[in-house]
Every structure is written in C-alpha cells, then in structure tokens.
C-alpha cells in the first residue's frame, strides 16, 4: 500500500512539477504584446492608427489612403471620437497648433509612444491632458470669450468638432512628408534583407537542379566563365556570313535586300531549271494574286473576281437585254461633243528649239570713236522728187512677223590678210558691188557677204542664198585685238515699170533688214552718207539693192573698217526672219534704169541675241538712242508713195563687249524692224 501510495504521490508530484515548469516557461500576454509591437512598428509604422481624410479631391484621397494602408494604418469614412488623426488640406489645419485650445500636434509616432507610456490614458482616447484650471478674473474671461468667438476655425465645422473631441489635426503636406520618409526606410530594410537571402541562396545553388536542353544548330551561345550570369543564346535558320561590301557604321552581318530585278531573274532561272528537269517544258509558277472583291449593282450580288463576273451568264444577259433600248436611242440622237480621253489622243511631241550656249568671243570690238554720227532716213515719194531731202529722225518700229515665209540673212566674213586694208564702198563701174536680190521662190533669202579686201579695191556683196551657222563655228569665232567700224550708207530708190504693163507689179515697197541692238552688242554698222542701196523693180519680181559709192569718196575717212589678223575668223551664216511689206505701185511713165537724185540714208541695227524676259525685250525695243530724242510720229503709207522709209538713229557706245550676241539662233530671237 505504501508503494502504491508512493506511486500516486510521486505521480502527483511529477505532475505538479511539470506544471510549475510550464508556468515558468510560458510568457505573459502583456510581454507578447510588447515584444511584437516593435517588430510591427518597423515594418508598418502606422499600425493601429485610425485616420479620417477631409480632402475634396478623390484621386488624392485614394492615393493617400493606399499609402496609409501600406504602412499599417486604417482609414474611416465617418468622423468620430475613435479617430486618431484628421488629415485636411485647409489652411486652418496649419494654424491649429497655434490655437490656445490644444497643444502642438505631435507626429503619429510620438503620439503612439505617448499612448503606450502613459499609465493613465484619458477616457476620450487622446494623450492630451487638460491643464489645471486657474482662477481668472471676470475681465479676462470676457476677453477669452471674445477671442474664441473671432477664432479662425468656424464653429460647427469638421475641424472645430475634431478639436472639441480631442482629435489630432494634420495638414496633408506633413503627412505626405512623413510617408515618404517611412517608405525610404522600409526600402533600405528590404534591400538589406534580400542581399542576405541572396548570399544564402548562392551557397546552396550548387545543390539545386537546373533545366537543361539542347540547342538546334546553327546557334550562337555566350557563357560566363565565372558562372555568375546565366548564358544567353540565339538560334538561327542559316549560319550568318560576313558582308565585306557593307559600309562601316552598319553591321557586317546585315544581308543586303535583293532588288526587284534580282528577284525576277531568280524566278526565271528557277523556272528554267524546273523546266529542264521535266523534259524541257517550262513550268509557270502560280503566283497568288489578291482578287478584288466587290458588289455588282446590276446583278445585285457580290463577286470575288470582276473579270469572271463580267463573263458570267447572269451579267451578260443583263448587259445584252433590250430593257434600256429607249435610253440608247435617245443617247444616240444627242450631239457628240465629248472631250477625248487622254489615253486615246496621241501625245504631241514638243518642238525643241536648240538654243546653244555660245562661248564668249573675246574681242576688242570697236575703236573709241571720236564723233557720234547720225544717219538720216529720207522718205522719198514721186511727189517729193524735186524737193529737198526730208529726214525723219529717231524712230524705232517693231513689226510683227505675220508672213509665213522665212527671210534669212547670211553674214559671211572671211579673213583679211593685210591689216592696213580699208573697207570702202565703190561704184558699180569699179566692180565693187553691194547687191540685194530676192528670188521668186516661196522663201526670200537674204545673205550678207563680206569678201576679202584687195590691195586697191574692196568688195561688199549682199547675196541671197540659204545657209546655216552651226554652233561649233560660232564657238571657233574669236576676234582678238581687232577694231572694226563697218561703214555704209544705204539709199533706197523706187523704180516703176512702163505703161505697157508687161511687167507685173511688185508686192514690196520696203525692205526691213534684221539687225541687233548696237547698245547691247556693241556692233556698229555705220554707213557713209554718199553710198546707197537702190531698189529696182524687175519683170522677174527681183528686189535688187545695189550699194554705190561716189567717185569723190576720200581714200582715208575716219569711219573705216580695219580688219587686223582675222585668220581665225571663219565664215558665219545666220538665219534671220525678215519682214517685207509690199504695197501697190501705180504704173507711171518713167524711164527704166532711172535713178532718183534724192537718196535715203539709214543704218542697220543689230538684233538682240536672246531676250531674257518679255519685259526686258519691250524695254529694249522702246528705248531711244539718245536721252534728248523726240518722237516725230509715224510715216504715212500712201498709195502714191513708192517706199515707206523710217529713220532709226542709234548711239555708238565705246565698249569692249563680246560679239557672241551677233550669232544667235533665230528661233528665240525677235526681229526689231525699221
């Protein structure tokens, strides 16, 4: 019995001993709470705090609510005494600390520590303890009451209610700054903890199994020798090759994109090779073309291919039906005045005018003339044969090219071996002639020829023939160190036929010689006052102009043409359009081969080579030769007058300009008539 009693006693003692040990090892609830709070305060510093947001903006309140929840806080939708902090964006929230009702607002952390450390927390949940009331006089109480009435915070507002309940008021800027600071601290803690964990994983990474696989060739793989980084790879369809022809900034492994021509050739070669394999028959590759789908309003159905639909029976029956025969009959009666389609009309080729860029001819063109000569054109009619010579001064005319026939002028200049020879106009008896002939063909061709000078005599012939001047001859034409003064005077006389009427009437009374502007081109043709051009009416409708020089021409005149060292000057031919105005001449009983004593003198002016602009050409045409020139009116075209003569007086300029403009193409130049 004793033994059993001993067992029971020991068992009871053992149990009691275990209970004592358990009581010693079991921690109290208060100690558990105090141990867990510091850990939570590190990770979530706003744990156990209740907030109320007094913010008008929904987005700001949602963002702030999310940050508070991340830090362990809680947001309530209704304001009550259980709320720890009120967050507002009003100005009064900043000045709540300066008010006499409450003490300065502590931070949430300090408020939390105050709650935990205070042994006797207040009943309203706030750590604020009202100071002991001091007995004040009646006057001071009235003053404080007046101050309270004029307080910044209005009564019956959220802030005033929070102050009355003892809720801490925080401005939104303060809570934002506090949240940012806590986020930085948490980020540093997490970073340090992850680094420690990564170190532990690296130690045990060798034991972990990794997924392995085989790469298909060809591939490129890059591995790290230290095995700190995992390898990366790239699988390719074809092994790349280096392109040496590519430029420097580009990668040498970039493949040049084949052009469309190369693709076509590759397709053709492939077709040929396939054809050779199958007994020489070419196999056409079926290329998939996108079919144009649409809707036919005539057949009221959709189609996938237009051509197949047009060839279908349903569409052909609709097109060939007689339902619209009435409309076709009405349309056929209408007048066809439609414009031809561009594809149907043949394209007209544009006429190309060859305007060559002539090389400049280096020359000192003219001598410095000491005197400015004026040449007068005398208008002679049959009534004025016995009167004195009348002159018409300084008139410039521009005649339009209305005739279809082309009149071309040829200026042929040949080298003169002797530099001391002088160009002189002599009489017909002395075999020096200057003749103008007009053939009875469709085109009246005028050519001016300068022949080489003889030792004693010089010849100047105006021959009518058709020649052309090439651009190569113009480029070779260079006049170096020559000074040329072409002198001549053209006299125009009118001859009529006998009363027999065997000779037909001439259609021409006036000959307009093409010329270039002396001012621009500096090419002066000065005719002497005594030589003349004689216009003769012949039975073969030839217009012959002969230049005669009187016997009393002095051998040495100041106006002479000196040609020096002109071996390099080839014969030049220029086409010019000349307008000839032909009038009706009455048959009068005058002797043939009769010559009027009165002769008209005029000067031929050179034509502008290329008109740069229509405005400039007009200005050049209507520009007078002298500053003080006067316009004396147009000459009258009477039936009795044989020839209409106009005076053009040009001023000679002392210049050393180029001679290129003298040989210009006729397609672009306009003729300035007399």
Swiss-Prot record:
Record keywords, A-Z: Cell cycle, DNA replication, Metal-binding, Nucleus, Phosphoprotein, Repeat, Zinc, Zinc-finger
Gene Ontology MF term list: enzyme activator activity; nucleic acid binding; protein serine/threonine kinase activator activity; zinc ion binding
Residues in BRCT domain copies: 40-128, 154-179
InterPro entries in the cross-refs: Replication_Regulatory_Kinase (IPR051590), Znf_DBF (IPR006572), Znf_DBF_sf (IPR038545)
Source superkingdom: Eukaryota
Tissue: Highly expressed in testis and thymus. Expressed also in most cancer cells lines.
UniProt modified residues of type Phosphoserine: 312, 354, 359, 381, 413, 508, 625, 667, 669
Region (Disordered): 1-40, 100-131
Subcellular location: Nucleus
Principal location class: nucleus
Role this protein plays: Regulatory subunit for CDC7 which activates its kinase activity thereby playing a central role in DNA replication and cell proliferation. Required for progression of S phase. The complex CDC7-DBF4A selectively phosphorylates MCM2 subunit at 'Ser-40' and 'Ser-53' and then is involved in regulating the initiation of DNA replication during cell cycle.
Binding partners and assembly: Forms a complex with CDC7. Note that CDC7 forms distinct complex either with DBF4A or DBF4B. Such complexes are stable upon replication stress. Interacts with MEN1, MCM2, ORC2, ORC4 and ORC6. Interacts (via IBM motifs) with PSIP1 (via IBD domain); phosphorylation increases its affinity for PSIP1.
Name assigned to this protein: Protein DBF4 homolog A
Species in which this protein is naturally found: Homo sapiens (Human)
Top-level taxonomy: Eukaryota, Metazoa, Chordata, Craniata, Vertebrata
């Amino acid at each position: 019995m004793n033994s059993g009693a001993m067992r029971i006693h020991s068992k009871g003692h053992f149990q009691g001993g275990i209970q004592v040990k358990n009581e010693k090892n079991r921690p109290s609830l208060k100690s558990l709470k105090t141990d867990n709070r510091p850990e939570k305060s590190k990770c979530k510093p706003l744990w156990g705090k209740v907030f109320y947001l007094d913010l008008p903006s929904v987005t700001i309140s949602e963002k702030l609510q999310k940050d508070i929840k991340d830090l362990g806080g809680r947001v309530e939708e209704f304001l009550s005494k259980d709320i720890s902090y009120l967050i507002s964006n009003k100005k009064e929230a900043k000045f709540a600390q300066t008010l006499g009702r409450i003490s300065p607002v502590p931070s949430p952390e300090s408020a939390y520590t105050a709650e935990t450390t205070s042994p006797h927390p207040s009943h309203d949940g706030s750590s604020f303890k009202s100071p002991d009331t001091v007995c004040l006089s009646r006057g001071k109480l009235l003053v404080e009451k007046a101050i309270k009435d004029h307080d910044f915070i209005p009564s019956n507002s959220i802030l005033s209610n929070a102050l009355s309940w003892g809720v801490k008021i925080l401005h939104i800027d303060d809570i934002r700054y506090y949240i940012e600071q806590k986020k930085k601290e948490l980020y540093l803690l997490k970073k340090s903890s992850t680094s420690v964990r990564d170190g532990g994983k690296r130690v045990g990474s060798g034991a972990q199994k990794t997924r392995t696989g085989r790469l298909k060739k060809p591939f490129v793989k890059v591995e790290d020798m230290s095995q700190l980084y995992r390898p990366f790879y790239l699988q390719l369809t074809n092994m790349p090759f280096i392109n040496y022809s590519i430029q420097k900034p580009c990668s040498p492994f970039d493949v040049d994109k084949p052009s469309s021509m190369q693709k076509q050739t590759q397709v053709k070669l492939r077709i040929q090779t396939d054809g050779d394999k199958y007994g020489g028959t070419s196999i056409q590759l079926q290329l998939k073309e996108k079919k144009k789908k649409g809707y036919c309003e005539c057949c009221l159905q959709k189609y996938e291919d237009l051509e197949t639909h047009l060839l279908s029976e349903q569409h052909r029956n609709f097109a060939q039906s007689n339902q619209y025969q009435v409309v076709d009959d009405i349309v056929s009666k209408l007048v066809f005045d439609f414009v031809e389609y561009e594809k149907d009309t043949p394209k007209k080729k544009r006429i190309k005018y060859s305007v060559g860029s002539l090389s400049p001819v280096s020359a000192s063109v003219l001598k410095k003339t000491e005197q400015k000569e004026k040449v007068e054109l005398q208008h002679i009619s049959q009534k004025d044969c016995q009167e004195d010579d009348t002159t018409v001064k300084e008139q410039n005319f521009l005649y339009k090219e209305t005739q279809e026939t082309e009149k071309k002028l040829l200026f042929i200049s040949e080298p003169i071996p002797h530099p001391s020879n002088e160009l002189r106009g002599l009489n017909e008896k002395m075999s020096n002639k200057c003749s103008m002939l007009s053939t009875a063909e469709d085109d009246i061709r005028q050519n001016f020829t300068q022949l080489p000078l003889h030792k004693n005599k010089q010849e100047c012939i105006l021959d009518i023939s058709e020649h052309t001047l090439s651009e190569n001859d113009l480029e070779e034409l260079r006049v170096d160190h020559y000074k040329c003064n072409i002198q001549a005077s053209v006299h125009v006389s009118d001859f009529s036929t006998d009363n027999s009427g065997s000779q037909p009437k001439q259609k021409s009374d006036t000959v307009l010689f093409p010329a270039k502007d002396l001012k621009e081109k500096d090419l002066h043709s000065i005719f002497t006052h005594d030589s003349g051009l004689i216009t003769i009416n012949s039975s073969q409708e030839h217009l012959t102009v002969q230049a005669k020089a009187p016997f009393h021409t002095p051998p040495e005149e100041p106006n002479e043409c000196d040609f020096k060292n002109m071996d390099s000057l080839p014969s030049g031919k220029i086409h010019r359009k000349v307008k000839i105005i032909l009038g009706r001449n009455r048959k009068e009983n005058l002797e043939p081969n009769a010559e009027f004593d009165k002769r008209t003198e005029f000067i031929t002016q050179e034509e502008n080579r290329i008109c740069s602009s229509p405005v400039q050409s007009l200005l050049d045409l209507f520009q007078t030769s002298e500053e003080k020139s006067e316009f004396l009116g147009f000459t009258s075209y009477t039936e009795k007058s044989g020839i209409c003569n106009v005076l053009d007086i040009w001023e000679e300029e002392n210049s050393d300009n180029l001679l290129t403009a003298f040989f210009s193409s006729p397609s672009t130049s306009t003729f300035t008539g007399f």
